[in-house]
Curated annotation (Swiss-Prot):
Signal peptide: none annotated. The gene is ectB. GO terms for molecular function: diaminobutyrate-2-oxoglutarate transaminase activity; diaminobutyrate-pyruvate transaminase activity; pyridoxal phosphate binding. This is Diaminobutyrate--2-oxoglutarate transaminase. Coiled coil: none annotated. NCBIfam families: dat (TIGR00709), ectoine_ectB (TIGR02407), PRK09264.1 (NF006733). The lineage of its organism: Bacteria, Bacillati, Bacillota, Bacilli, Bacillales.
């Protein structure tokens, strides 16, 4: 262990986690690459857990931010009116919302994903006058009490230290037995007065569950869930903190399903540059907040408004979205071939778009593959309740050449774990 790393062992809490998976001291990053203090280069298939969809230190965003700081632009403003916030709101409306025929009010609840989830739950309860929320198995929504209450992971929930109440967990699409119609099961509870389940204020879900195992809901499942919500006057909250901002191939992860959620939670890559920013979008008729009823010191991050506005300009060019879709096809073709070529993995391809991975029934395999990949210069994490999925999450801007290099490292890592000497895929 080097001297720098020993500082973290001595002074930082045991709660730290990613530095255990990636034991290096990083000093520099650009695009989809990172370098450690020894000069070792890594291809980044992690992208800040989805906070760096545009890569590290994007030139357009960096220049806009440097110019703003050099001009003594305001940094902290709570929810006061500033030019950067006005520019961001206008760009979001013109480039993202209007073209998709989405009419949403924008709320800045605080700097992180859990802030937007907390505000969404709070608003849903305020609007409906109901207390209960329906969440789904393997969902992950944050680490504060409200968002943790709608999270499925047992180890995360255990950290709360108190009962997590006013939430009913229902089975996600294809949970357990893939033949079971989980929404028919859910609706039975809503319809039957003897079920013991009250009509909730809202349902909250990810269209692709990130931390829960890269579980992608089918489009027809999402459409049916929206119909159920409308039938029972339940608000539908889509948590797009990780699955949004192009990660699944479109700006919002729900676009392909053709649904219109009542409330949308955004964070991570909405700031563009990796700077903290969160938004809660909701239909105008739900905007019944009293001034200051929900607030937070760091909800006016002007540096993030600057980079977020620059990031949205990518979406003005249709070729950007097309490139995401083209590279997504390559990712899924590679994963499919890998599963077919190495049956010893007992694996299956999971996810959608740039939110993909392989789930393996071989105990510990995913973690071992990720560790071998790191040794070979690729940063990749695991997901799922048992860490049974190794997860591909490269920046959307990655070059085809380095995407292929990443694929080669992953296959080498799979071979190393399985003890296969020669590559099987070509």
């Amino acid at each position: 262990m080097n001297e720098t790393m020993s500082i973290f062992n001595e002074l930082e809490s045991e709660v730290r986690s990613y530095c255990r998976s990636f034991p290096a001291v990083f000093t520099k990053a650009k695009g989809w690459k990172m370098w450690d203090e020894d000069g070792t280069e890594y291809i980044d298939f992690f992208a800040g857990a989805g906070a760096l969809n545009y890569g590290h230190n994007d030139e357009k965003m960096k220049r806009a931010l440097i110019d703003y700081i050099a001009d003594d632009g305001i940094t902290h403003s709570l929810d006061m009116a500033t030019k950067p916030k006005a520019a961001f709101l206008k760009k979001l409306n013109e480039v993202i919302l209007k073209p998709r025929k989405l009419n949403y009010k924008v709320m800045f609840p605080g700097p992180t994903g859990t802030n937007t989830v907390e505000s969404a739950l709070k608003l849903a309860r305020k609007v409906t006058g109901r207390t209960e929320i329906i969440s789904f198995t393997n969902g992950f929504h944050g680490m504060t009490i409200g968002s943790l209450s709608v999270t499925g992971n047992a180890s995360k929930r255990k950290g709360a230290g108190i009962p997590l109440t006013n939430v009913v967990t229902m089975p996600y699409d294809k949970f357990g037995d893939e033949e079971v119609d989980t929404l028919r099961y859910l609706e039975q509870f809503l319809h039957d007065n003897g079920s013991g389940v009250d009509i909730p204020a809202a349902v909250i879900l990810e269209t692709v569950q990130g931390e829960g195992g890269i579980n992608a809901a089918r489009m027809e499942w999402l459409q049916q869930l929206e119909r159920i919500c409308k039938k029972y006057d339940i608000l539908m909250i889509i948590d797009d903190v990780q699955a949004g901002i192009g990660r699944t191939g479109t700006f919002f992860s729900f676009e392909e399903a053709g649904i219109t959620p009542d409330i949308v939670c955004l964070s991570k890559s909405i700031g563009g540059y990796g700077l903290p920013l969160a938004l809660t979008l909701f239909k105008p008729e739900l905007d019944i907040w009293a001034p200051g009823e929900h607030n937070g010191t760091f909800r006016g991050n002007n540096h993030a408004f600057i980079t977020a506005t620059a990031a949205l300009s990518y979406w003005e060019d249709p070729s950007f979205e097309q490139a995401i879709k083209d590279k997504s096809k390559k990712i899924h073709a590679f994963l499919t071939k890998l599963v077919d070529s190495y049956p010893e993995m007992d694996g299956c391809v999971k996810g959608r778009g740039f939110m993909a991975g392989i789930g393996s029934k071989v105990d510990g395999l995913a973690g071992k593959v990720a560790a071998e990949a790191f040794k070979r210069g690729l940063i990749m994490e695991t997901a799922g309740p048992e860490d049974e999925v190794f997860k591909l999450f490269p920046p959307l801007t990655i070059s085809d050449e380095d995407l292929e290099k990443g694929f080669a490292i992953i296959e080498e890592s799979v071979r190393a774990v399985l003890g296969v000497k020669e590559p099987v895929t070509t």
